């Protein structure tokens, strides 16, 4: 398994985002907050749609794609003030909304070699037609049709390989 340092890439969205910025790995614009008032001010400045994420692991339910400012404010208050996700929600990452389809790209890495597994796309939303809140997972299909060979190669070159290189440079493969 991963080292404790590397496990933070999955266990803390704030850590992962900071890691990506530090190592010039493409990611959406973001800010991290533990204060609800500051987070709400940021949402008001950025506008909606916007994505609110509990920093820690929240059983697949810690991400709210807020289509309105009020929905974003409610999510911030639930996470930071309402303690909805316990310690996982003691910080939030507020991220730029990116239009498009999401796919999962999982690799096995031994510190140097990359073995890509089959890609997949989740059925995350509770309602028909990809509507409603995210769930912990309603199912998935694989391989993900949006991951063409060109997309696959681009993800390896611009995301996966730079992560491996950065972990090795940090002495934490």
Regions found by a protein language model. Name each.
Residues 8-14, 127-129:
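Short, charged, surface-exposed secondary-structure boundary motifs
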Residues 1-11, 25-32:
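A short, GP-enriched loop/loop-strand-helix hinge that lies immediately N-terminal to
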Residues 4-6, 16, 38-39, 71, ...:
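Catalytic-core regions of core metabolic enzymes
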Residues 47-69:
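Conserved anion/nucleotide-ligand pocket segment
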Residues 31-35, 66:
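Short acidic-hydrophobic, aromatic-tinged amphipathic segments that line or gate anion-handling sites
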Residues 66-173:
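Internal nucleotide-binding/catalytic subdomain
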């Amino acid at each position: 398994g991963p080292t404790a340092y590397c496990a933070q890439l999955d266990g803390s969205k704030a850590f992962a985002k900071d890691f990506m910025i530090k190592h010039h790995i493409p990611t959406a614009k973001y800010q991290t907050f533990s204060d609800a008032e500051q987070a709400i001010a940021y949402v008001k400045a950025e506008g909606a749609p916007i994505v609110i994420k509990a920093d820690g692991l929240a059983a697949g339910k810690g991400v709210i794609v807020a289509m309105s400012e009020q929905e974003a404010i409610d999510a911030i208050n639930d996470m930071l003030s309402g303690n909805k996700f316990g310690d996982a929600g003691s910080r939030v990452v507020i991220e730029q909304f990116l239009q498009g389809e999401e796919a999962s790209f999982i690799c096995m890495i031994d510190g140097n070699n990359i073995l890509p597994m089959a890609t997949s796309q989740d059925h995350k939303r509770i309602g028909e037609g990809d509507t409603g809140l995210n769930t912990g997972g309603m199912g998935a299909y694989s391989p993900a049709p949006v991951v063409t060979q060109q997309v696959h190669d681009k993800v390896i070159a611009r995301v996966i390989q730079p992560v491996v290189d950065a972990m090795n440079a940090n002495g934490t493969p």
